[in-house]
UniProtKB/Swiss-Prot annotation:
One of its GO terms (molecular function) is toxin activity. It is found in: Secreted. Has the structural arrangement of an alpha-helix connected to antiparallel beta-sheets by disulfide bonds (CS-alpha/beta). The keyword Flavoprotein does not apply. GO terms for biological process: defense response. Residues 65-67 form a propeptide. This is Neurotoxin Cex10. Signal peptide: none annotated. It comes from Centruroides exilicauda (Bark scorpion). Expressed by the venom gland.
Length: 67
């Protein structure tokens, strides 16, 4: 599946260098996530080819610090 990586807080894993981004690419390709490629899009790490079990944004019942 494709999607934004998400923190336990419910926020997207943020990034600042838009487009090709080594940090996002490395995060997406971690073994437990299984992604094939990652880049920075709208200041969040977006991954392609993630394992179905990898949580992606938005998380149910988590709104990134908003109540």
């Amino acid at each position: 599946k494709d999607g934004y990586l998400v923190e336990v807080t419910g926020c997207k894993k943020s990034c600042y260098k838009l487009g090709e981004n080594k940090f996002c690419n490395r995060e997406c390709k971690m073994k437990h996530r299984g992604g094939s490629y990652g880049y920075c899009y709208f200041f969040g790490c977006y991954c392609e080819g993630l394992a179905e079990s990898t949580p992606t944004w938005p998380l149910p019942n988590k709104s990134c610090g908003k109540k």
